């Protein structure tokens, strides 16, 4: 476990993120819960906690600096990625975690209780049925960018942003058709030799 903690500290340093030992323990406790539930409920395709450390934890932390304001909705959150990871980092920020699969929300309610994460609100619904005001609308491996926009455009205002976490495929053709101001960022994930990108979308003024 000390080796994993050292790896987290190194990743935090590379990402220029300050975190406490309590937060590091919370991230590890979360991954252990995810690994445990995964054996029964198939929460994620990644089964090994060492692999989860990089492909889930570090991948989620790599977009932390792009989160603005006080509230975020995590669309198709699955096992809580990136929402739970970011909620541990930003305890004053409210995260609404949305998924249509009941067992995943059941898991997230367990995470909330086990880790005393009072700033997450897991909701079992389809995103198009949710109402609310959020500074960030984020998705990771949820859908194509144009589908993400169509399902979530009712949240978009002049003051907030949509963030799509993507791999190599930036869906350039889909992006060109969207009536939005779009910025693309190349994301470096510590210990991961794979292309990661973040697409930030805002309403045209």
Curated annotation (Swiss-Prot):
<dbReference type="InterPro" id="IPR029063">
    <property type="entry name" value="SAM-dependent_MTases_sf"/>
</dbReference>
<dbReference type="GO" id="GO:0005829">
    <property type="term" value="C:cytosol"/>
</dbReference>
<keyword id="KW-0949">S-adenosyl-L-methionine</keyword>
<feature type="binding site">
    <location>
        <begin position="127"/>
        <end position="128"/>
    </location>
    <ligand>
        <name>S-adenosyl-L-methionine</name>
    </ligand>
</feature>
<comment type="similarity">
    <text>Belongs to the methyltransferase superfamily. RNA methyltransferase RsmG family.</text>
</comment>
<dbReference type="Pfam" id="PF02527">
    <property type="entry name" value="GidB"/>
</dbReference>
<keyword id="KW-0698">rRNA processing</keyword>
<protein>
    <recommendedName>
        <fullName>Ribosomal RNA small subunit methyltransferase G</fullName>
        <ecNumber>2.1.1.170</ecNumber>
    </recommendedName>
</protein>
<comment type="function">
    <text>Specifically methylates the N7 position of guanine in position 527 of 16S rRNA.</text>
</comment>
<feature type="binding site">
    <location>
        <position position="81"/>
    </location>
    <ligand>
        <name>S-adenosyl-L-methionine</name>
    </ligand>
</feature>
<dbReference type="InterPro" id="IPR003682">
    <property type="entry name" value="rRNA_ssu_MeTfrase_G"/>
</dbReference>
<feature type="binding site">
    <location>
        <position position="76"/>
    </location>
    <ligand>
        <name>S-adenosyl-L-methionine</name>
    </ligand>
</feature>
<feature type="binding site">
    <location>
        <position position="140"/>
    </location>
    <ligand>
        <name>S-adenosyl-L-methionine</name>
    </ligand>
</feature>
<keyword id="KW-0963">Cytoplasm</keyword>
<dbReference type="GO" id="GO:0070043">
    <property type="term" value="F:rRNA (guanine-N7-)-methyltransferase activity"/>
</dbReference>
<keyword id="KW-0489">Methyltransferase</keyword>
<keyword id="KW-0808">Transferase</keyword>
């Amino acid at each position: 476990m000390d080796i994993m903690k050292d790896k987290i500290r190194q990743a935090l340093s590379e990402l220029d993120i300050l975190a406490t030992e309590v937060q590091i323990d919370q991230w590890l406790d979360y991954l252990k819960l995810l690994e445990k539930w995964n054996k029964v409920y198939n929460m994620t395709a990644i089964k090994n906690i060492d692999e989860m450390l990089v492909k889930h934890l570090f991948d989620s932390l790599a977009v932390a600096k792009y989160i603005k304001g006080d509230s975020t909705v995590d669309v198709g959150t699955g096992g809580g990625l990136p929402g739970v990871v970011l909620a541990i980092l930003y305890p004053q920020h409210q995260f609404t975690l949305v998924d249509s699969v009941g067992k995943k929300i059941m898991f997230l309610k367990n995470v909330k209780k086990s880790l005393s994460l009072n700033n997450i609100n897991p909701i079992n619904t389809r995103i198009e049925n949710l109402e609310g005001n959020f500074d960030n609308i984020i998705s990771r491996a949820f859908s194509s960018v144009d589908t993400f926009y169509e399902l979530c455009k009712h949240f978009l205002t002049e003051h907030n942003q949509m963030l799509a976490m993507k791999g190599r495929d930036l869906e350039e053709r889909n992006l060109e058709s969207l009536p939005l101001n779009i910025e693309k960022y190349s994301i470096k994930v510590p210990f991961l030799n794979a292309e990661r990108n973040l697409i930030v979308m805002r309403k045209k003024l």
